[in-house]
């Protein structure tokens, strides 16, 4: 078995940066930025990897592509910086979270950095987007990259809880070794689908049960979320 403490994201990037698709992807995004506003900012694109070291991953929450309005995307799926208005999907995530733990408090902000620092890897399937155009960077190569990320986590880590919300995320299940990890699925927290399975899925509570059963420290989902 591989020693997770001797393997890091650096090892992963050293592998991927040699691949033709990745070189093409980075060059393509660079060219798009010359004529178009792209989110998140260049220095935030890989924030998920900076906030959550490979060896600390307990949970993976897989999103789709970044928010496409100004000031929202900052490299963590579903998250927005402090002070930014909560997008609808994030509002619904917090509704479900509060219902999981019968907890309520006003003035909650949308920055999920505290989750990331506790081992919740907040990954989008596509890591960039052009301003105002959702899914505009689909099929540029990000899907190949993030599929490799998921495979790498599945191979190197053990006992990770994968939260797959929505059809796009659920299609990634085949990348995960279900014999050594846990997969929880539901509809997307978007207003279009939240009542079709996301509300009431109890994923936050179930995740902590699965972590505790492995003698891992549960996630404090409310840590540093209040303004």
Swiss-Prot record:
<comment type="function">
    <text>Excises uracil residues from the DNA which can arise as a result of misincorporation of dUMP residues by DNA polymerase or due to deamination of cytosine.</text>
</comment>
<keyword id="KW-0378">Hydrolase</keyword>
<dbReference type="GO" id="GO:0004844">
    <property type="term" value="F:uracil DNA N-glycosylase activity"/>
</dbReference>
<dbReference type="InterPro" id="IPR036895">
    <property type="entry name" value="Uracil-DNA_glycosylase-like_sf"/>
</dbReference>
<keyword id="KW-0963">Cytoplasm</keyword>
<feature type="active site" description="Proton acceptor">
    <location>
        <position position="65"/>
    </location>
</feature>
<comment type="similarity">
    <text>Belongs to the uracil-DNA glycosylase (UDG) superfamily. UNG family.</text>
</comment>
<dbReference type="Pfam" id="PF03167">
    <property type="entry name" value="UDG"/>
</dbReference>
<dbReference type="InterPro" id="IPR005122">
    <property type="entry name" value="Uracil-DNA_glycosylase-like"/>
</dbReference>
<dbReference type="InterPro" id="IPR002043">
    <property type="entry name" value="UDG_fam1"/>
</dbReference>
<protein>
    <recommendedName>
        <fullName>Uracil-DNA glycosylase</fullName>
        <ecNumber>3.2.2.27</ecNumber>
    </recommendedName>
</protein>
<dbReference type="GO" id="GO:0005737">
    <property type="term" value="C:cytoplasm"/>
</dbReference>
<keyword id="KW-0234">DNA repair</keyword>
<keyword id="KW-0227">DNA damage</keyword>
<dbReference type="InterPro" id="IPR018085">
    <property type="entry name" value="Ura-DNA_Glyclase_AS"/>
</dbReference>
<dbReference type="GO" id="GO:0097510">
    <property type="term" value="P:base-excision repair, AP site formation via deaminated base removal"/>
</dbReference>
